[in-house]
Amino acid sequence: MITNKLRRTLIVGALVSASVLAGCVSQEKYNKLNDAYVKLQQAYQGDEVEIKQLQGELKVTIKDKILFPEGGFRLDAKAQAVLAKMVPTLSGFQNTKIVVRGYTDSVPIGADLKREGVTTNLDLSSKRADNVVDFLLKKGVSANLISAQGMGESNPVASNNTPDGRAQNRRIEVTLVGPGN
């Protein structure tokens, strides 16, 4: 029979152990994301790519003009070369969610895109994110880890009232979230 004093000691010990283990996992996650940050900074040196290490995640933002022709969603050879730079880093993760989000400005969809079945900015951003994911999958990034989301004109990072603001809002974000191994 376990006494109350022994029971309290065991509970406190279990809580301390859990806290220590959680700290180790957090430090390991931080180290893995930091290593990825350094590798991506080196890979994209001089490119129009922004890499940010945030609380428990790593975000790579690529301006759409690097990846897509204006109003388009297909990746050309230059775009594929830009995306290929992140493949070695992304392929090193086994237990980390990789979310590819496409964003647009608020300019209405033109007639050319409508003829291709793209009727809204949400459709356009979804096709862009899907094409990035398809490319990364073909290059060996695990299908179990990666997903695509079209965000349309939601979550602008700048005003859509100026050409520069609209250009900033047209982007792809690749975010790594999760345990980091």
Report residues per predicted region.
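Bacterial N-terminal signal peptides that target proteins for export
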Residues: 1-14
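Periplasmic peptidoglycan-binding/anchoring modules of Gram-negative envelope and division proteins
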Residues: 39-46, 71-102, 106-108, 133-137, ...
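Short, solvent-exposed beta-strand/turn patches at coil↔beta or beta↔helix junctions
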Residues: 55-84, 104-121
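C-terminal motif of bacterial Sec signal peptides marking the signal peptidase cleavage site
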Residues: 20-23
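Periplasmic OmpA-like peptidoglycan-binding domain that tethers envelope proteins to the cell wall
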Residues: 73, 103-181
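Bacterial signal peptide processing site
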Residues: 25-28
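Extracytoplasmic
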Residues: 44-47, 55-57, 63, 85, ...
